[in-house]
Regions:
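Glycine-rich phosphate/adenylate-binding loop
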Residues: 2-140
Length: 140
């Protein structure tokens, strides 16, 4: 919390792979205030999520999707993960970073990609700005 600006100020794209909501909210809020691109990957058990937010272009944010920390917050240490899932999430995240660097429009921008390693299922969910979002005045 005390050094996020020092770490992030020189980077237009921020990658998040943290496994707790407090840190995700901190990174989300920093990126939206500073108009950064945030590419976030999260995994748990057999499932993964990938977010691609471009806060330069009026994107919804992580708080729009999840306004509060769930009371039953889980993490990789307590629940475990399918080991190949970490590689999948990292590869998908890296792919989104490369597309952002090359200014290639991504269908994932502003959306949530949900993937399941047991069934090899992939779904894309359109994220909308939440009118009650804590960051609604920063969305543009």
């Amino acid at each position: 919390k005390n050094n996020i600006d020092k770490i992030g100020k020189n980077y237009p794209i921020i990658c998040d792979g943290t496994d707790n909501f407090k840190t995700r909210y901190l990174i989300n809020d920093y990126c939206i205030k500073n108009k950064k691109i945030l590419i976030s990957a999260a995994i748990n058990k057999f499932d993964g999520q990938l977010f691609n937010f471009d806060f330069r272009n009026k994107s919804p944010c992580f708080r729009c999707f999840m306004p509060q920390i769930p009371s039953d917050e889980v993490n990789c240490q307590s629940d475990g993960i399918m080991t190949t899932l970490a590689g999948m999430a990292g590869s998908l995240q890296a792919n989104e970073v490369i597309k952002s660097i090359l200014n290639i429009k991504s269908k994932k921008r502003g959306n949530l990609l949900i993937f399941n390693s047991l069934n090899s299922d992939f779904r894309t969910v359109k994220l909308l700005k939440n009118p009650d979002c804590k960051n609604k005045n920063l969305h543009g």
